[in-house]
């Protein structure tokens, strides 16, 4: 049974809303905290790291809660709605820190940022957990996932292109007010897009659709054991963490790089927004690319193209030649690579859910995607921490002309660090990841045979008692 266009577009629009709401945090929150609120880079970097350590605990717990959920609306939809509404409120508060001062301000920043991460987890885990429940077919997943990734990328590029102009226009001399008002626009898109997704996207091959609910009674300890027993999930965790650290260093530091190293913050939109077209074209043609090439080749491209992007920026620095065309080329290389990565990662997590059911006899969509959410936020936090540490070491001072040492350190942050982490991702994939070719086909044939014996109705899951005992061991 093929997936309808209504399902694909509705799922895609939901991704647009949620990534529109999170993009401002990944791209501009550190800038807002340091250059608008006036917090030290050390405080901000430490906060981001502590929050992500908490997420390492909180995300699997949320995955466990979602896994145990049974309702008339399905396993995932109630949490998507609850998380969207809660995260919308916290997002507005997150960009209200400029209204406070002193100790009150620091406490407010810490509390709201940690709550932001928790509430985003509530909706993000079940949102992506829908992928393996919509279809088991490999090709259908490769055709479905580009839709949410396309709209998510579109949201990111819109955020990069319009945030600062909106903030400057609405806020004028008060950038804090401009950021605060922009969050209201994001929240409106967030809520409307979520409602559309909830109405038109349905669970079919969920663990809800098996004859018993044994899987919903797994203990938290057993759930954590699932993560470590699933070797392919552990491999993906390492790859995705390295990739997210690299890409978040670039996106999080780009505003600093263009402001101080290149010396013209107005060139920043050229780097991200103009490259958006290449990113979106990549997503549109992904099904054809993966069919004519292979996932292995596309993963290599996802890792190598951003390194070439860093090379272009390095060449510009060495030549002291800041050319718009070269900036656009660097942005295109980066965004084509990240487009391939995000589609492949979502598909790979769905495959890993199948692999977990095949190997451990337990299907836990929300657990696998809780790890994905943890890694995405962890990559953002580690990137911010690395940026903060290096900025502190090189003597960075906001809103002034930087020293030669500081400019050299900024080159290290923007070019050397991401290159290192992209290479780690590439090595891990070719050394340890195995869900390709015949292995993947064998798993999916096994599961299709299994589900043909069970009508795809919203009845409870059949998890063998022996399998649960094995996981708990």
Swiss-Prot record:
It is a multi-pass membrane protein. It catalyses: melibiose(in) + Na(+)(in) = melibiose(out) + Na(+)(out); melibiose(in) + Li(+)(in) = melibiose(out) + Li(+)(out); melibiose(in) + H(+)(in) = melibiose(out) + H(+)(out). Changing residue 19 to C: Abolishes transporter activity. Can bind Na(+). Large decrease in the affinity for melibiose in the presence of H(+). GO terms for molecular function: melibiose:monoatomic cation symporter activity; melibiose:sodium symporter activity; methylgalactoside transmembrane transporter activity. InterPro entries: MFS_2, MFS_trans_sf, Na/Gal_symport, Na/Gal_symport_CS. It is found in: Cell inner membrane. Changing residue 138 to C: Can transport melibiose. Its main location: membrane. Keywords: Cell inner membrane, Cell membrane, Membrane, Sugar transport, Symport, Transmembrane, Transmembrane helix, Transport. Gene3D superfamilies: MFS general substrate transporter like domains. GO terms for biological process: melibiose transport; methylgalactoside transport; transmembrane transport. Changing residue 59 to C: Loses ability to catalyze Na(+) or H(+)-coupled melibiose transport against a concentration gradient. Does not bind Na(+). Binds melibiose in the presence of H(+). The record marks 141 as: Important for activity. Residues 2-16, 61-77, 127-150, 205-232, 288-296, 347-378, 429-473 are cytoplasmic. Mediates the transport of melibiose and other galactosides by a symport mechanism. Can use sodium, lithium and protons as coupling cations, depending on the sugar substrate and the cationic environment. Alpha-galactosides (melibiose, raffinose, p-nitrophenyl-alpha-galactoside or methyl-alpha-galactoside) are cotransported with either Na(+) or H(+), whereas beta-galactosides (lactose, L-arabinose-beta-D-galactoside, D-fructose-beta-D-galactoside, methyl-beta-galactoside or p-nitrophenyl-beta-galactoside) are cotransported with Na(+) or Li(+) but not H(+). Consists of two pseudosymmetrical 6-helix bundles lining an internal hydrophilic cavity, which faces the cytoplasmic side of the membrane and probably contains the binding sites for both cosubstrates. The cytoplasmic loop connecting the membrane-spanning segments 4 and 5 is close to the sugar binding site and may participate directly in cosubstrate translocation by MelB. The charged residue Arg-141 is probably involved in the reaction of cosubstrate translocation or substrate release in the inner compartment. This is Melibiose permease. It comes from Escherichia coli (strain K12).
